């Protein structure tokens, strides 16, 4: 039992190999209007803002695994509703699991599709 506990401590202290990531020049996002069913795809450069209806969507960064450009993209976004003072979403969203950090809005969903790769 003591040996097992010591092994767990050693494994916890050993850093995991970090996955190398690359920042893309931009990304692709999808916006869904849950009332009308309208879907809009956005292609944004890093730092660019686009309006979709009452939403203003800004892409801060889009990153992907360096060794697998088609792999799991994740993007940092800031989204405002009707030019409000406070964003309805600010943070990172993972393309393969947008629900992990989802935008909470009664009418709109926004999620990452992919990063633009060279």
Where are these regions (language model features)?
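N- and C-terminal low-complexity/disordered segments
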Residues: 3, 16-118
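Sec-dependent signal peptide recognition
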Residues: 1-8
